[in-house]
């Protein structure tokens, strides 16, 4: 479930006319070095859609999520740093993401469990989207994230169409209300600490 909320990474799959969800989407564009560089940085979770009513109930408890992705080229992983606003309090988490370059699959590791999702990138809108468990009608889900918390109506409509094209209903979509964010101060403190940490080695060499 955690992967749904956070990976919130991303991407927009082509929307085709076929009615069968397995054929309606061409899942998994290859992940290149250029893709990984583009993904690096800050993202805002915009919306989540899920066919599991229990999961929708849980995700509604999480008011906002934004996250940072940092590429590690040495071992082909990405660091995921998440800021969740829940019950008007900020919760910070960090984790590692793995990926398969050939089929555009992302993995979040939770203990020994490997949770996959399928990634496509929509550079035109500065947005990314993840697709989960499309073959399972009871667990099927999508998430949309963007570089900015305020998205244009066009992108909102694209996400809504993506939801219906995989056999889900627009009523299963939950949009994030960014006025409820409570993590800006904690993020600021972390960024200041990172800045100071980068300064220290330089000062010691001076």
UniProtKB/Swiss-Prot annotation:
Superkingdom, natural source: Eukaryota
First-listed, main subcellular location of the protein, grouped into a coarse class: secreted
Signal peptide: 1-18
Glycosylation sites: 33, 75, 103
Disulphide bonds in the chain: 90-183
Stretches the record annotates as Disordered: 187-206
Keyword Ubl conjugation attached: no
InterPro entries: A1A_glycop, Calycin, Lipocln_cytosolic_FA-bd_dom
Location of this chain's protein in the cell: Secreted
Entry GO CC: extracellular space
Physiological role: Functions as a transport protein in the blood stream. Binds various ligands in the interior of its beta-barrel domain. Appears to function in modulating the activity of the immune system during the acute-phase reaction.
Record comment regarding domains: Contains a beta-barrel that binds various ligands in its interior.
Similarity field: Belongs to the calycin superfamily. Lipocalin family.
Protein name, as recorded: Alpha-1-acid glycoprotein 3
Species the sequence originates in: Mus musculus
